[in-house]
Amino acid sequence: MMSLINLDLVISAVTSIANPVIKEKILRSETVIKLLQQFNLDPEHPPADFSGVYAYTLVEYGVGKPKAFLELFRQEAIKQAFRKALDHNNPSILLSEVDTFLDACTLGDEIRSLELDVRREVAAFATVFIEVAKRSRTPADVLMNQQIGSLHKRIAGIQEQLERLPTLEGIRTEIARLAAQNYPALTPTATENQCRAIALAQQMRGWFETLGYRLEKYEIWAEEYFEWIINVPVRRSYDRILVRGVAGEVRLSDVMALCQSVNQQKTDEGWLVSTRRISRAARDEVKKEENRHLDCFTFDELIDLDADFSGYLDWLEAEIKRRKIDQKYVPLACTKEEIDPVTKRRIGISRYEAEDGWIDGYIDLWLDDPAKEHISILGEFGTGKTWFVFHYAWTALQRYKDAQRRGVERPRLPLVITLRDFAKALNVENVLAGFFFTQHNIRLNSEVFDQLNRMGKLLLIFDGFDEMAAKVDRQQMINNFWELAKVVVPGSKVILTCRTEHFPEAKEGRALLNAELQASTNKLTGETPQFEVLELEKFNDEQIRQVLLYQAEEATVEQIMGNSQLLDLARRPVMTDLILEALPDIEAGKPIDMSRVYLYAVRHKMERDIKAERTFNSLADKLYFLCELSWEMLSTDQMSLNYRLFPERIRRLFGSVVQEEKDLDHWHYDMMAQTMLVRNADGDYTPAHRSLLEFFVAYKFAAELGALARDFTEVGQAQSGLDSSTASIDYTWSGYFSRQLDSTGCREVIAPLRQFKSEFLDKLRETFGKAKLTKAVIDLLLPMLDDNEPLIKIIEATRGRTEDEVNYVGGNAATLLVKLNKMVLEGRDLSHTVIIGADFTNTSLRCVNFTEANLAYSVFTKILGSVLTVAFSPDGKLFATGDSGGIVRFWEAATGKELLTCKGHNSWVNSVGFSQDGKMLASGSDDQTVRLWDISSGQCLKTFKGHTSRVRSVVFSPNSLMLASGSSDQTVRLWDISSGECLYIFQGHTGWVYSVAFNLDGSMLATGSGDQTVRLWDISSSQCFYIFQGHTSCVRSVVFSSDGAMLASGSDDQTVRLWDISSGNCLYTLQGHTSCVRSVVFSPDGAMLASGGDDQIVRLWDISSGNCLYTLQGYTSWVRFLVFSPNGVTLANGSSDQIVRLWDISSKKCLYTLQGHTNWVNAVAFSPDGATLASGSGDQTVRLWDISSSKCLYILQGHTSWVNSVVFNPDGSTLASGSSDQTVRLWEINSSKCLCTFQGHTSWVNSVVFNPDGSMLASGSSDKTVRLWDISSSKCLHTFQGHTNWVNSVAFNPDGSMLASGSGDQTVRLWEISSSKCLHTFQGHTSWVSSVTFSPDGTMLASGSDDQTVRLWSISSGECLYTFLGHTNWVGSVIFSPDGAILASGSGDQTVRLWSISSGKCLYTLQGHNNWVGSIVFSPDGTLLASGSDDQTVRLWNISSGECLYTLHGHINSVRSVAFSSDGLILASGSDDETIKLWDVKTGECIKTLKSEKIYEGMNITSVRGLTEVEKATLKTLGAVENREI
């Protein structure tokens, strides 16, 4: 049926729309839809006739256009010209008719007065018409072809693309692209060839016009071909060439027809052009002498006449072969975030590995998708970005050459454009001109490039955005990105590579590369292109093996694969070559770290490069030159230097010894032979890899500081012209190489170098102190330093100077110092010094005098204990934390800035929660109180008292009028917020209350308890109306479903139960867990339940059926906490394995493992918008994670020093303690002084033990290692690695030849002290091993575990001899009696059990503690047993009677460790209150209290500059003082 629509009415309706409306895209789309519906046009399915499509197009195109233009399209003559042009496959008819019409009528004058490009508007109208026509099918047709997109959105996108097209040729190219697709409404009988002919004609016309060729009036259009005549300028005249376009294959008959047309039209030449291919006969025919005026081309071959890329192709091929990428490339994996198109939040992640063809496979798909135009490839340094770029360019080049050889349509030509050499403020025209003209001598102007780009002929690859972006500030970087984005136009494909760590904040980097941050100038008009981001993954083991096998023998590869340090370094592709180069030194037993691998490799490379007959034949001179050149490149952001510029630099660096031309010639040849700088054909030198520059700069800094380690100094000592008879002396870096000629004209002879000494401050200010050190340089610099004193003297040299005189010298030196030794500055007088931008995090600054020092921009430790609980405010702007120090803190979510510190609790804060209006926060603590805090001021509004034991959980009612608290006193209390009164005490539970939860309307409260029940309480009556029974162990977690109809509970009985609220019945018992369930949580839609616990598995359950949908695995320790994202698509959890994991619910895949915590993760919370995740850990940090990128936005770090373990040395004169501050301390008993502090662990020290003769000490840590320390030297003798989780306990065997360690990885390892080898791994426990101990005769080993068992192992056979059962909670400590007849065990069930070794029976159960028993020890004579508990007491028991002799009070927090002196007269106890107490065993009295000083104890900050008052207050809390306080 024909669509009869009055165009006058359409124009009237369209022009009546107010202009402001059309500026908003959404409003414009809504307006268009309403107008279409007004004229009975279906917005999704246009009518299938010409008139209907024409009217539809007038609405889509016309909204916001001047009325005069719409009047033009209303004219019948224009409408008929449009129909004729399309029916005859000749779009140029329309443009010609429009010109004629405008010349002949007054409307033309009105339109021209608007100063708009008429032809452009006509072409834009035609483009919209084609797109509408493509959709003019039935809904069934549309669905069948899966064309489910919204039409008006698609057209809006096309119109926005057209707004980005600056030229008519660009619009013609876009029309050609659309015309290449069939559009049935236009020409129902049109063939595929006709559509191709239209596309070819449009591209050719655009190409000819871009080249400046004039088209004559002559045009022929037929079903299989079209003909034009073009005028090609030749000197002062032009050639007339007849062009015949053929959509299909050019055959011999086409050549004959061309010849006939050329003769008829009397042109100079004739060209046949095809999109497809040309037959052999046709090519042979035009080669004949009589046809020398004829030629035939594919369209690509036609382009070759004026765009010659052959020189570039030769360069690209040579560059790839030089890099050996064609031979040694190993496929790389990548990840890509999946973004919700509506919320713009990340909802998942895709990993592209072998099954998907790696990153190559994704880029192939991206190239084939016409909607995608730009992609950024991110990766850390050395992960293979440039490697991949040249590999993919090589792959694309082979495809291109193959198509070129076969004479078929070619794929895109890859153009690799490196950004390292361009100016700080980019101009894309200059970048392209530099690439085409300067680098590759390709004579293309910008118009020709633009046309090739729009026609889809190019693949643009910009490599190294980070190397350019690092030169500028944030806004200029954004401007530069958008400047490059100018080449992103319809039809283009652009790849950009960039270092991940370039961006100071991962979130900002993502936002920029996803085109979310706008430029301050040169913005793109209209809708931005579609941008994507991929991120390269580091090598896995198999990839490492593969790349090594390309370069080394199997035995060498296995040697590297077997070395964990080398394997970790080799995860970056850039390091594999260096490792192989350095292998001889590694095999010789030299130390291994990243800097030394560079050192060994660089030395071998330089030795190979040196030729004896050349001037620069010493390692030292070459090293100096490369260091200075690297510094110049990095500091000036000039990543390449032409050889012509080197003579001046050589003269400047080496003085008069190279003034003669022959010396420079020697240097020139020497440079051409070396391998660390790559020279191109133009003589430009660039580093083989940026990290080499960073290594040489780090070396230069270490030498200038006078702190270079001896093995690094050896390269500098390899100098020529030395007087070997003279004693070696110290030189400055610059002085050593400033050699002059002696009186005879020979290079002066100097004394050998002993070591480098520090440069003067003025010199350091221009190099080392020019800017804050980057992470890459710091990481390479630290292993090079072996002397603290020069750095200290440099800091002291800043005394009395101004900030401008020092720059970052003092701050950089201080940062390096404290990273090497966290205690090195203790007691130093640094008054009046200038220390700008230092990082003092977790550094001991005890008794440092900073009086009147300038500490601007320096970072210090915050006060923060183990973070036990985290909660976001309802608006997501704040989050709150509660920690083991009893402190509640408020933080700004956007910046990580600490806003308020709320003090009042005097013990652990276990739970925090915001009120619904976000104005208040409640906190529950081990101090038996609940506190209510004002969010705006941080003031404590009320303190709710009444509980008689720790408060484990607090929660506001939905209306925020009441607060519920659950406690270990077996009660739940309901508090009135306004009055502070306790409304009800819910009694009935006979065990600790672990969890409380309100239902949705606040009418009910559920509680889970250690008495194995769940209770449901009616708030109005305070009565318990249901007791849910069925669990057979304590209930740790309860939660209501979102509709309030069900309740879920997780228990230590290894089950989850679903309860029906209305009936009180158990709907399902969800079984599958093999250990206690710690956390349960419903998905936001209530369809699923997640559960996690000690079996290291998360299970997802279907609520309707009770079936386990799937299990999420990969954990190596307990799952402590679970939370769904607000949209329900992601599940986050915290674990005792120190990792936060994010799971995609739909794919069941782990999206991210968020690593960085060095202790258990106690709490995780999503922000209300789901964009940020906060995690709190026992490592005394809160980390904020960006969900979209998985990057850590902020680390909020603090400090406490719980004492986890104490032990006396064999003679009882010394006590060792292990602490949560990552240190081991030795204390002298008589003086109570701390003798020394052992540093090296990177997390809590959980256990310490002396060997039998007291010469060594072993320590086990949450960093998964055991360290062996020499008491006399305080040095670490060895680090035992192998455990995959915390090391909780260490023990020597009686003769000291072996060491046992128990770990959270559920194993016990036996180590040989002499060889440092692991002799045996004992397996059998199903949860953490908390304690290990040897029998007195050394034949057996006992272990206690969180699986509630004690196991007895045979040392000789490794077999488990016996398993002791009876405890009902974890076993935290085991110890043999001195005679070996009894084994004692302390447990979380609050008891100590004594077991008979001979019978395996329990002799006594010692009861009396009212909290966990974590540590036990026998007296030396075996008559007494001491036990330390979380109830803050130590108990002394008589072994023979089982009687408690004393209860020792004094600690104000959990007691973690107890130890007897060798004579049995003194008992030591270590506590979370940060003290060690010494007790008289006979009287039970406390003799002494040992307490380590606070981290900033006695630090004098009188009149210090550069710190805020809040920062000063924090420092004072950590021990700092001002004069008035001294």
From Swiss-Prot:
Chain coiled-coil ranges: none
Repeat is among the record's keywords: yes
Secretion signal span: none
InterPro entries named among the record's database cross-references: 5peptide_repeat, G-protein_beta_WD-40_rep, NA-iREase1_dom, NACHT_NTPase, NNH, P-loop_NTPase, Quinoprotein_ADH-like_sf, WD40/YVTN_repeat-like_dom_sf
WD repeats: 334-376, 862-901, 904-945, 946-985, 988-1027, 1030-1069, 1072-1111, 1114-1153, 1156-1195, 1198-1237, 1240-1279, 1282-1321, 1324-1363, 1366-1405, 1408-1447, 1450-1491
Highest taxon of the lineage: Bacteria
Alphabetical keyword list: Repeat, WD repeat
Domain annotation Pentapeptide repeat: ranges: 823-862
Keyword field contains Repressor: no
CDD domains: WD40
Protein known as: Uncharacterized WD repeat-containing protein alr3466
